[in-house]
A protein has these predicted regions:
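Membrane-interface helix caps and helix-loop-helix hairpins in membrane proteins
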Residues: 82-89, 302-306
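Cytoplasmic-side transmembrane-helix entry/capping segments in multi-pass membrane proteins
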Residues: 39, 90-96
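Membrane-interfacial loop- and helix-cap regions that link adjacent transmembrane helices
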Residues: 2-32, 44-67, 94, 104-315, ...
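Alpha-helical transmembrane segments and their membrane-interface exit regions
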Residues: 75, 98, 315-322
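C-terminal transmembrane helix pair
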Residues: 318-324, 381-384
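Central hydrophobic cores of alpha-helical transmembrane segments in multi-pass inner-membrane proteins
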Residues: 1, 72-80
Length: 417
């Protein structure tokens, strides 16, 4: 779709531009708003993870809400970077930081037990907590594994939440257009994306299976916070802090651009970011954006529940629901074109011989099998999103029944003592 709709005179810059050219302005605004929400929540999720990391490094002596605030304040500074090109070297460094964390985490979990203090953030806790609850003598249940759906006291909620974690980890189509439009050599991005997806898929699958094999239901998300030796916890948390700050800066950069270019500029008449006034507004808006992300993080101190909710409501849509929906409309428009129709670049006039349901059906049946497949894919993705959203909301409701889990709490989600 990008190659078919992009042009030198009318370049594609955002995900919403695809929706605009296929379905019109209302759908474009809807996608831009949802994209802004996702990017804001992504920054919030990263603040939660690093708030947990800082609280773990401080051995839970520092208030959890303050830990989140420290990371948000760091975001005030890194958020002042306006162009994605300046993130290139930092993003590359972040990859190798994460690889280092993966290697060290695997080495540590292979020679030590799970982090029982952090069972509140474990996979077993998301399944009702029965498999990670100690007995009267304080002995924790043995490590167990499940080849199919794991046993749960909450029905299918925990299993669907686990599925949403996979969606959160692998879903990334939302930023495709933004990266393509900002890179001077799009073919390099295309090759880089394929290599990155292959690398991520292989590493994530192996790493996930490895940690689950050694820690079972005690596996924590983020995983490096589930290692038991404090020294290696600190190594992973400090390096993860730096890596996450780069990722949060990237998400915040694109999130602010989407908000500014598609809401402030279109609806409020704000000046372009390339102007002096635009740069001043950017500098002033960055703290506001990060403050909103901090409020989300501190108000919902449940990493597993929030990531599941963001995955179901946002990431799943941009990766699995919207692509077949957009491609279906794109193919219908192409298939409906009759001889003599088209756009005249000299006059700016679009010629069409008919319209309405007749035109839509003609376009649909032109590529019947492909269009039917994308329609089924779209509907299936909607059902999965509904199940994911329901499960995530129920998980958060159950989590907040715990008196220690409150908004803006000082008690770290990883401290189960």
């Amino acid at each position: 779709m990008f190659l078919g709709l992009d042009s030198h005179n009318y370049p594609m810059r955002t995900y919403g531009d695809i929706a605009f050219r296929v379905y019109g302005t209302p759908v474009r605004h809807g996608l831009n708003i949802l994209q802004s929400i996702q990017l804001l929540c992504n920054v919030g999720v990263i603040i939660i993870a690093n708030g947990q990391a800082l609280s773990q490094v401080s051995k839970f002596h520092l208030c959890y809400a303050i830990c989140c605030l420290v990371f948000a304040l760091a975001g005030f500074m890194i958020g002042q970077v306006r162009t994605l090109q300046k993130y290139g070297w930092f993003a590359n460094a972040a990859i190798w930081m994460n690889v280092f964390i993966i290697i060290t985490s695997m080495g540590v979990v292979a020679h030590s037990g799970p982090n029982y203090i952090a069972v509140g953030g474990s996979a077993g806790a998301a399944l009702g907590g029965l498999s990670v609850t100690p007995d009267a003598n304080g002995n924790f249940p043995p490590i167990v594994h499940s080849a199919g759906l794991p046993p749960s006291t909450q029905g299918f909620i925990g299993a669907v939440d686990g599925l949403m974690q996979a969606v959160y980890a692998y879903g990334g189509a939302m930023l495709f257009t933004e990266f393509m439009s900002e890179m001077k050599r799009p073919r390099d991005f295309w090759k880089g994306m394929i290599c990155a997806q292959g690398f991520i898929y292989i590493v994530y699958i192996f790493y996930g299976c490895f940690l689950y094999g050694y820690q079972g239901q005690y596996t924590v998300n983020p995983s490096f916070q589930g290692v038991s030796p404090y020294a290696w916890q600190t190594v992973g948390n400090v390096i993860g802090f730096l890596s996450a700050l780069i990722a949060a800066g990237l998400y915040g950069n694109i999130g602010i651009k989407v908000l500014y270019n598609n809401i402030f500029t279109d609806f409020l008449g704000a000046p372009l970011l390339s102007t002096k006034k635009g740069k001043i507004i950017w500098a002033a808006f960055v703290p506001v954006y990060w403050s909103a992300a901090f409020i989300i993080a501190a108000a919902i101190p449940n990493f597993f529940g929030l990531t599941s909710l963001v995955a179901a409501l946002c990431i799943l849509q941009f990766t699995y629901t919207f692509p077949p929906m957009l491609f279906l409309g794109y193919k219908i428009r192409l298939g409906a074109v009759l001889e003599g129709e088209g756009f005249n670049p000299l006059t700016g006039i679009v010629t069409r011989h008919d319209g309405g349901i007749k035109r839509i059906l003609r376009g649909y049946f032109k590529h019947f099998l492909m269009n039917t497949w994308h329609l089924i894919f779209f509907l299936g993705s909607l059902v999965t999103a509904a199940l994911g959203a329901y499960s995530a909301i129920m998980s958060l409701i159950i989590a907040f029944r715990n008196p220690q889990v409150t908004a803006f709490t000082c008690h770290s989600p990883l401290d189960s003592t």
